[in-house]
Amino acid sequence: MKRRQALKISSIGAIGLTASISSGCSKNNYFFHHGVASGDPLNDRVILWTRVTPQQVGPLEAILEISENKNFSSIIFSKKLQTSSLSDYTIKYDFLAKQYCDSDMGFFYRFRAGNVISDTGQSKTFSENTTTAKIGIFSCSNFPAGYFNAYQAAAEKNNLDLWLHLGDYLYEYPMGGYATDKAEKLGRVPEPKHEMITLSDYRQRHAQYKEDQGSKALHKHAPLIAVWDDHEFSNDAWKRGAENHSEDGAEGDFYARRSAAIKAYYEWMPIREQKNKRRIFREFKIGKLIHLIMLDTRQYGRDKQIQPKEYLTKSGFNQAKFYNDLNSNNRELLGSEQLSWIEKSILSTNAVWTIFGQQVLMAKLKFPDISKMLRSEEIPSFLKPYLKFLGLGIPSNLDAWDGYPAERNRLYQLMINAKKRFISLAGDTHNSWVSKLEDQSGSKVGIELGAPSVTSPGITDILNLDEKKFVNSIVKINKELQWMDPSNRG
């Protein structure tokens, strides 16, 4: 932990040194290393983003250009925009597309700085008459774990109207940490090499991810709607802390760390900012077809996760106390403010489908006894503490909605009362899932599609399991689960 403190001090020193460099740039000393992006499309406007890299420190100006054709033979809109080190030289503009071009048809955009021109991006808004939409779903894109081939492939298909990222857009771990064992071989060592803690750390890691060729290809192809999960902050985050943040303060104040992560996220993502920066939950309407509600199940209202090991006694596992605490009506995942907002939101539209874009699995899920499925006699050290809980029939993923059953029931009741058909989209697990969602009485309330990771390893790889045995067993013992795939990324 002393190493992390030293790194924080060195980062502060580096910032001070950079700030002392004289300002002023020649017109040719600009670069667009991080591509362009668009996001948060409404029926009349969309966010357009880029990052200008100057060779010297100081405020600078860039020009946004919009055209209805790719060669920009006719520019229908242009605007001078300012940026500086205060926003890490990122630029965002909320373009009122409806005034200049037809909704659904799309447009092209680019930026100029000096004599340098950025990549050309393509974006669009969705009119009230939209009847079809092709949407890509992504989650868990871990740079050192592998190439972002899924992004590249989606861009090359050239048929997406929109893509969603359900969280873990980037990871906080240092070199030598989670899923970095192949990083040097792949040429994907995380930057900085230490764990993200300061604003400088988060900015540098975001910059590295945005420089990836697959990422740049997809970002410029179609608008993005994104929400954060935990790794944009720190593993297993909740509203007042995180598993990967030391309680003794060796990693600094958690709230300061979270604020730094949020600031960098808003700077580097094509997302529309709200007055309360922590409030990322928001809604989008794609014609009368889809009412898309992006939730925050991670840090806005979430209570701390229950840890089964805390219910171990000398006489065994205290199931009575475990279930009493787990099922408490006071446990929140969304929080009352967000839940009330959802209720008002779903009652305000008559879209054919209500879709929740959110972070963690909503379906009820129990794990089989995997001790006999291990392909190696050596049990991973991190797995050993959990083996004693297998076979007890308790929920297995308490970081997901299974850890907050009362809150899940409250959400289900809202949807039942509003007579809404809904789809839950989830990320987080790195695996693919299809489940039918049921309320406490066993009545169907919706379906869930769990998205695989872009690169983070799946459960059978992490635990070294026999894939066929695991899939057959987990589907068999879970009533809601219809299908799962732990091995394919995408």
Task: Annotate the PLM regions.
Residues 3-9, 15-18, 26-490:
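Metal-dependent phosphoester/phosphodiester hydrolase catalytic core
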